[in-house]
Amino acid sequence: MNLTIPFAKGHATENDFIIIPDEDARLDLTPEMVVTLCDRRAGIGADGILRVVKAADVEGSTVDPSLWFMDYRNADGSLAEMCGNGVRLFAHWLYSRGLVDNTSFDIGTRAGVRHVDILQADQHSAQVRVDMGIPDVTGLSTCDINGQVFAGLGVDMGNPHLACVVPGLSASALADMELRAPTFDQEFFPHGVNVEIVTELEDDAVSMRVWERGVGETRSCGTGTVAAACAALADAGLGEGTVKVCVPGGEVEVQIFDDGSTLTGPSAIIALGEVQI
């Protein structure tokens, strides 16, 4: 039986998502539905889906049941713990549609609560700052891409990352690099990993490309930009700082502190409609 449901399409530094409002938790969103909707030829097309639901209606949620919960799904249908770009768009949706009253509020995720501040917003665009928590450095590891081995820093942002700062790599050379699915240490990353290839820190900025677990290469990855900033600062012998992270989809600002991190960047809601699934 076909269901007709409302949706919105949006992106945060061109990491694009389908927003599915499900405030009454009536939709049984299956992996097959997610794959179909995210298909860029046969569906709407997106890097993932953000289902808008209360935490009380999410199985296994450990956050305050009254919070709005970002039920995030990767394009392959798998559940995901956290998405920094997705949180910005999710917060933009909640605020612009009147589902929250304040510009500062909490959002539930599978990685726990994330606090957000709406710095500017209208129905179409926003600038949002997200409290990303303390980056958990898990150690050093490597990956192989196209036969080239990259050494990197394991960083857990609620989801696993391997941020590889490459000595001497320029932004133009990074842009020209052929990025394919990496092979990695599955004992170190038993649940898979998001891999970032990062230039060295220069003038408080880095460039980054990312291969996301369950998706492939994306134009941006919010948690990945925090992992990249953390790795670039460590590579430069620094424990904290503010880093501009340039991704194919735009720019974000990451701040790393002793006791946490923030991610600030844009969000855009570009379409509203209905879809049959």
From Swiss-Prot:
It is found in: Cytoplasm. The active site is at C83 (proton donor), C221 (proton acceptor). Its EC number is 5.1.1.7. GO terms for cellular component: cytosol. It catalyses: (2S,6S)-2,6-diaminopimelate = meso-2,6-diaminopimelate. The keyword Isomerase applies. Pfam families: DAP_epimerase. HAMAP family: DAP_epimerase. Its main location: cytoplasm. Catalyzes the stereoinversion of LL-2,6-diaminopimelate (L,L-DAP) to meso-diaminopimelate (meso-DAP), a precursor of L-lysine and an essential component of the bacterial peptidoglycan. Involved in the succinylase branch of the diaminopimelate biosynthesis. Belongs to the diaminopimelate epimerase family. It comes from Corynebacterium glutamicum (strain ATCC 13032 / DSM 20300 / JCM 1318 / BCRC 11384 / CCUG 27702 / LMG 3730 / NBRC 12168 / NCIMB 10025 / NRRL B-2784 / 534). Disruption phenotype: Cells lacking this gene are unable to transform L,L-DAP and show an impaired growth when supplied with low ammonium but high concentrations of carbon. This is Diaminopimelate epimerase. Pathway: Amino-acid biosynthesis; L-lysine biosynthesis via DAP pathway; DL-2,6-diaminopimelate from LL-2,6-diaminopimelate: step 1/1. It is an enzyme of class 5 (isomerase). Substrate binds at N15, N74, G84, N85, N159, N194, E212, R213, G222, T223. The record marks H161, E212 as: Could be important to modulate the pK values of the two catalytic cysteine residues. It comes from the Bacteria. InterPro entries: DAP_epimerase_AS, DAP_epimerase_DapF. Homodimer. Keywords: Amino-acid biosynthesis, Cytoplasm, Isomerase, Lysine biosynthesis. GO terms for molecular function: diaminopimelate epimerase activity. One of its GO terms (biological process) is lysine biosynthetic process via diaminopimelate.
